[in-house]
């Protein structure tokens, strides 16, 4: 099993193998997920004080906040996956 690392901005990296979803923080259910993760001490704020633009949910229940667009994170995720596939 290869480890996929995804850059989520400002030098922060998450394991692509653990990502369940990448979503926008605008909706009430996502805001509730963020609040619950904060209460459980499973929220990772990687925005460096900037506006949250993407919320990354992992299989361990951690929630990661990123200051880059969800589409950008998804593109990096897919391009990293394509690079790994072409190496085989």
From Swiss-Prot:
Disulfide bonds: none annotated. Pfam families: RemA-like (PF04025). Transmembrane segments: none annotated. InterPro entries: RemA-like. Belongs to the RemA family. This is Putative regulatory protein AM1_5498.
